[in-house]
Regions:
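Short coil/turn motif common to extracellular beta-sandwich-like domains
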Residues: 33-46, 158-163
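Structural motif
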Residues: 42-53, 167-175
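Short helix-loop boundary/capping segments
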Residues: 167-202
Length: 202
């Protein structure tokens, strides 16, 4: 009698565990089947003879409330990314720069490039490091359709840093061991999506 009662009590337990496992598998399939489309990105660096970047960062900012931000890194020549279908704003910029830093990258309108502060001859001076070459692609409206074939995007990054040369005449050079100079009135940063420099000068 005791044997029969134990069997009747224990049989439902394995069935209950199996139900939990199957439910977890079904949920996993829903996540794995989230629809994405391929985006084949090709970058044209014509005219960039020196200091070609090794890596670029690509960000798709959703313009729909239910969309998801997609962030990835590609070789300088480009590559393929997987993006859910939808409407996006898009940013591409050269990555792994020594001086240029990025902040505010949670939104298309706030992502900003800048350089860190540095200490000049006078500790009270407000100075920043000179930026290296920085290239950007900013697209306000990109539609990613649901498709089995990859969408092809051919992009040409734009240089957003200007270079200037200065000649300094020094008298009595035999008595000088070093010369330090700096330029004032420079912009403190650059908004990638808005294509605007910050108003604050350094």
């Amino acid at each position: 009698m005791n044997v029969v009662e134990n069997i009747r009590y224990n049989v439902p337990l394995p069935l209950f565990c199996l139900l939990i496992i199957l439910s977890g598998c079904n949920f996993r399939e829903v996540l794995d089947d989230y629809p994405v489309s391929g985006v084949q990105i090709t970058l044209d660096w014509t005219g960039v003879a020196e200091n070609l970047p090794e890596t670029v960062r690509v960000i798709f900012y959703p313009k729909d409330a239910e969309g998801r931000k997609v962030d990835g890194y590609l070789p300088a020549a480009g590559g393929e990314m997987k993006v859910p279908p939808g409407n996006y704003a898009m940013i591409v910029y050269n990555y792994s720069t020594e001086c240029v830093c990025i902040e505010g990258d949670e939104c298309y309108g706030t992502i900003r490039a800048y350089t860190e502060r540095c200490i000049g001859m006078d500790a009270g001076e407000d100075m920043i490091w000179s930026p290296e070459d920085f290239y950007v692609v900013a697209l306000d409206d990109v539609e990613i359709a649901k498709s089995e074939a990859a969408m092809v995007m051919k992009l040409k990054p734009e240089r957003v840093v200007s270079s200037y040369s200065f000649a300094v005449k020094v008298d009595g050079v035999e008595n000088i061991s070093a010369v330090v100079c700096y330029v004032s009135g420079l912009n403190g940063g650059y908004f990638l999506g808005r294509r605007l420099c910050t108003l604050a000068e350094v």
